[in-house]
Amino acid sequence: MFNVGANLSSWGDRVKSSLAGMDLKSLGRVGVLLGGKSGEREISLMSGNGVLEALRSKGVDAHAFDAGLRCPTELVKEKFDRIFISLHGRFGEDGTIQGLLELLGLPYTGSAVLASALAIDKIVTKQVWISNGLATPEYEELTATSDWNAVVQHLGLPLIVKPAHEGSSLGLTKVKSVEELPAAYKLAAGLDKKVIAETCIIGDELTCPLVGQGKTAEALPVIKIIPPQANYDFHNKYFSDETQYLCPTGLAPEVNAAVQTLALAAYKALGCRTWGRADVMLDQKTGKPYLLEMNTSPGMTSHSLVPMAAKAAGIEYADLVLWLLSQTLQQKEGATT
């Protein structure tokens, strides 16, 4: 059995209880890693500054560290006791920085090396999910020599083409004809050596934040996303005031529960910890949910979804940030899985 909707209020109560009894001095000097070098740098800066402000508002000795402007070896000079990772995409969400922090013996928020490396690769992620019997759209890895007609015959139209290691919809194209495939591939290949095409599931776009680890992992409330013109691109994700977020979703309770169960199984299959967010499509014809991606370092901007779900469970932004950081107190050296 999975810990889903029925435990939401108790999760919120446990968070409040744990924070009430926390000695902030035990957190020591905290580094907030932000910025970085990926295509999601701008969003990382927004997330990181929000996290930094929240921690300081709680009285935590927190300091920004721009991983895109400073040499990682400077982390040693800063004498941080623990790290809050607010990096998104490659070199921040792919196991790279996690491996460095392991070597330095610094506890950090989010998934460890292996889970981070698995989740950043959309193709490997799908392989893990499929091996665990979890529903995800049909896919193919594209190359410059792919047979475009064969791809369409396999996946149907419309289909989605995107870089395998990018997030925030960077380089993503919804392909409606075989003639559009070469250009879509070229766009994605300009950002990544590995490109994936997958069947486009038509229906409701949902996301489900997750917290915890292993047997104690839990799914937070599901959020339904309604972007303008049904286009949830980079701009509409982070800057548009026209994108609607519904929490509660307005869907039947059993549908929400099915999405939470699927998302939690996906989170556990990858070995994620602390927090994450599963993106899901709900097929309008069959009502079946399909897994798209797992985010192991979700955004924490004003438009971000994990804070929204946490608030629905009774936890405000600053308390969520502090609780996530507090999970590093439980980490043991060498926990790379």
UniProtKB/Swiss-Prot annotation:
Q: Where does Mg(2+) 1 bind?
A: 279, 293
Q: Does the keyword Isomerase apply?
A: no
Q: Name the PANTHER family for this protein.
A: D-ALANINE--D-ALANINE LIGASE, D-ALANINE--D-ALANINE LIGASE B
Q: Name one GO biological process term.
A: cell wall organization
Q: Which cofactor does it need?
A: Mg(2+); Mn(2+)
One GO cellular-component annotation of the UniProt record comes to:
cytosol
Chain residues that bind ATP:
152-207
Top-level enzyme category = ligase
| Gene name for this UniProt entry | ddl
Residue sites binding Mg(2+) 2 per the record: 293, 295
**Metabolic or biological pathway, per its Swiss-Prot or TrEMBL entry:** Cell wall biogenesis; peptidoglycan biosynthesis
Q: Does the keyword Manganese apply?
A: yes
Places the protein is found = Cytoplasm
* InterPro entries to which the protein is assigned, alphabetical: ATP-grasp (IPR011761), ATP_grasp_subdomain_1 (IPR013815), D-Ala_lig_Van_CS (IPR000291), D_ala_D_ala (IPR005905), Dala_Dala_lig_C (IPR011095), Dala_Dala_lig_N (IPR011127), PreATP-grasp_dom_sf (IPR016185)
Provide the alphabetized UniProt keywords: ATP-binding, Cell shape, Cell wall biogenesis/degradation, Cytoplasm, Ligase, Magnesium, Manganese, Metal-binding, Nucleotide-binding, Peptidoglycan synthesis
What name goes with this protein? D-alanine--D-alanine ligase
A Pfam family for this UniProt protein?
A: Dala_Dala_lig_N
Instruction: Return the similarity comment.
Output: Belongs to the D-alanine--D-alanine ligase family.
